[in-house]
């Protein structure tokens, strides 16, 4: 989505917003670390956009579009791609714009840019001498395909710059077609506000995003201020010098200084904060949290025509997507990747399930984003099924924030069924996804609500879990006695058993809204379930492989992934939310049938 369109959207227009800048790392490991960081930062709340820098002289012309593609398509966060014209031919400019457009990126930050290190700037054959030339070229040849941003320099591009003259150059870029301004970093907030007043007086009325540089450490703070030529207010020095040899102290005091600066900006009516992250996250999170913005924008955008299921549209064709299988509820990026080649995405209902072919699960990109050390720190080294059950129970109690099948903490809606989930997991019915019954909750409800205002939302109770083979027959027989309950069961090989009609979707979430058809955003369906099981078992095997080959934990988890069944149960009687869990109250548990398996170490 274009930044200019977002700024007009009611979910963004009146709010304080934030956005991030990242730069392309030089190694593949660095790139993966960046993706992991973005994945974490996305859970804080919804950034308006993420921008990715362009190397001097086009040195990252391959890497920058690739990173933009992953952020836009896989993480479903709207992007803004930097594009410089230094040492760039017209063909290179067109190629970069084409790649950006293909990924769904509709925002370009047009810059002159610096020459490659140890070379002088020369005007290329393309005739791009200034950023205004690039803005004119994009607007002339691509019309309104892109929202174009330009740089603003509140303290001048260099220390000797005439500010009034630089504002004239800024006005030229705006006249050529720029839609928004991202400014150079600064610390003198009073000077910045005065500069904004001058910009407005010059007839420049497009949105301004102030560039906020968090203070991470003393040396980097001084180096960046000197490099960019910005003024450091005396009270910054008075606050930081006493702790300059203490990185934690500098970060803590630096956060307070930046928070104070942001509050002053917001009070003056400047509400679009743009963070230069330097590919780091801790200080940025501290600032956002202390500004009271953490998680504030996490709810999905709802416009007047469509209900979007994701934080931002990854591609224009996903804007109207309205239905997804529930299995990927906590693994959105993987679902987008596996459906990226679909010609049509379901909108009002889930279509013929025989038509879409899910792509293969990309375990390298969408597998566990943790090192073996991080896995053992987070999940320990379980040595029995009882210990695994306790681990899953701790996730349901919010004592740990993730499991292999969910990168996110368990949702607040699960509080309604927490006791039932705890009982299931401690009896070795290992739950990886669930939702409680809802019967006409207001669409504005802070936990359960979604969709347009003045509506009502409904849910069928649903639970997905792994079960030991010795319990499978008893499970199916118990379910069959409850006419309202449907089940789907498969093993690692994909042998499916169900008491439902094959390939017929079962809506498990729906909403009723004024002047609208009923919206059914999540479903359960057999073909999707079989596609999901490949991913579910793969994630479990990745967890196992984090331990040494001869370890008890490795053997235990491998055995579980090879032998246990993956089950989904839906109670179609959503007015009776307890009957689904009555299934497990009527059953024996693994520790009842095989205590030697439940408590014993793997051999």
Swiss-Prot record:
One of its GO terms (biological process) is methionine biosynthetic process. GO terms for molecular function: FAD binding; methylenetetrahydrofolate reductase (NAD(P)H) activity; methylenetetrahydrofolate reductase (NADH) activity; methylenetetrahydrofolate reductase (NADPH) activity. The modification Phosphoserine is found at residue 355. FAD binds at residues 53-54, 82, 112-114, 130-131, 153, 173. Its EC number is 1.5.1.20. Its cofactor is FAD. Major methylenetetrahydrofolate reductase required to generate the methyl groups necessary for methionine synthetase to convert homocysteine to methionine. Performs 80 to 85 percent of the total methylenetetrahydrofolate reductase activity of the cells. This is Methylenetetrahydrofolate reductase 1. It comes from Schizosaccharomyces pombe (strain 972 / ATCC 24843) (Fission yeast). The lineage of its organism: Eukaryota, Fungi, Dikarya, Ascomycota, Taphrinomycotina.
């Amino acid at each position: 989505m274009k930044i200019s369109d977002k700024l007009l959207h009611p979910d963004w227009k009146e709010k304080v917003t934030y956005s991030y800048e990242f730069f392309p790392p030089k190694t593949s490991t660095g790139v993966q670390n960046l993706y992991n960081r973005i994945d974490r930062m996305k859970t804080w709340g919804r950034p308006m956009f993420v921008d990715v820098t362009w190397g001097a002289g086009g040195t990252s012309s391959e890497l920058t579009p690739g990173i933009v593609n992953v952020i836009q398509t896989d993480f479903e966060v709207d992007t803004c791609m930097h594009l410089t014209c230094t040492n760039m031919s017209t063909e290179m400019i067109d190629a970069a714009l084409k790649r950006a457009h293909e990924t769904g990126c509709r925002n370009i930050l047009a810059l002159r840019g610096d020459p490659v290190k140890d070379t002088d700037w020369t005007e290329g054959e393309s005739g791009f001498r200034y950023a205004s030339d690039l803005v004119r070229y994009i607007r002339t040849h691509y019309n309104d395909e892109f929202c174009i941003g330009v740089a603003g320099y509140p303290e001048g591009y260099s220390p000797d710059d005439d500010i009034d003259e630089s504002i004239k150059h800024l006005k030229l870029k705006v006249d050529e077609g720029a839609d928004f301004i991202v400014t150079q970093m600064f610390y003198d907030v009073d000077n910045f506000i005065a500069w904004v007043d001058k910009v407005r007086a010059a007839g420049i009325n497009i949105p301004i995003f102030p560039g906020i540089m968090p203070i991470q450490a003393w040396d980097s703070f001084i180096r960046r201020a000197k490099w960019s030529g910005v003024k450091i207010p005396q009270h910054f020095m008075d606050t930081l010098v006493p702790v300059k040899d203490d990185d934690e102290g500098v970060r803590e005091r630096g956060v307070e200084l930046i928070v104070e600066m942001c509050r002053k900006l917001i009070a003056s009516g400047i509400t679009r904060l743009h963070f230069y992250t330097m590919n780091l996250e801790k200080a940025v999170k501290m600032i956002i949290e202390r500004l009271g913005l953490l998680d504030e924008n996490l709810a999905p955008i709802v416009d007047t025509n469509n209900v979007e299921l994701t934080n931002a549209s990854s591609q224009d064709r996903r804007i109207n997507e309205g239905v997804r299988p529930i299995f990927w509820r906590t693994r959105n990026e993987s679902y987008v990747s596996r459906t990226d080649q679909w010609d049509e995405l379901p909108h009002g209902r889930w279509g013929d399930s025989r038509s879409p072919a899910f792509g293969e699960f990309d375990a390298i990109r969408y597998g566990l984003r943790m090192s073996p050390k991080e896995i053992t720190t987070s999940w320990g080294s379980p040595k029995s099924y009882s210990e695994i059950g306790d681990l899953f129970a701790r996730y349901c109690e919010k004592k740990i924030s993730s499991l292999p099948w969910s990168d996110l903490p368990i949702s607040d809606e699960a509080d309604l069924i927490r006791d039932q989930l705890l009982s299931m997991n401690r009896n070795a019915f290992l739950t990886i996804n669930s939702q409680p019954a809802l019967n006409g909750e207001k669409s504005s409800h802070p936990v359960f609500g979604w969709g347009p205002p003045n509506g009502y939302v409904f849910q069928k109770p649903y639970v997905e879990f792994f079960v030991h083979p010795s319990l499978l027959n008893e499970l199916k027989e118990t379910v069959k006695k409850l006419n309202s309950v449907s089940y789907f069961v498969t093993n690692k090989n994909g042998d499916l058993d169900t008491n439902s009609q094959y390939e017929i979707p079962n809506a498990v979430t729906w909403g009723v809204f004024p002047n609208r058809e009923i919206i059914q955003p999540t479903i359960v369906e057999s073909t999707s379930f079989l596609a999901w099981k490949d991913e579910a078992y793969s994630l479990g095997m990745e967890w196992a492989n984090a331990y040494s080959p001869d370890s008890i934990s490795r053997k235990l988890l491998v055995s579980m992934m090879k032998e246990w069944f993956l089950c989904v149960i839906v109670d179609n009687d959503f007015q009776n939310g307890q009957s689904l869990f009555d299934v497990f109250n009527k059953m024996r548990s693994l520790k009842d049938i095989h205590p030697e398996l439940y408590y014993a170490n793997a051999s």
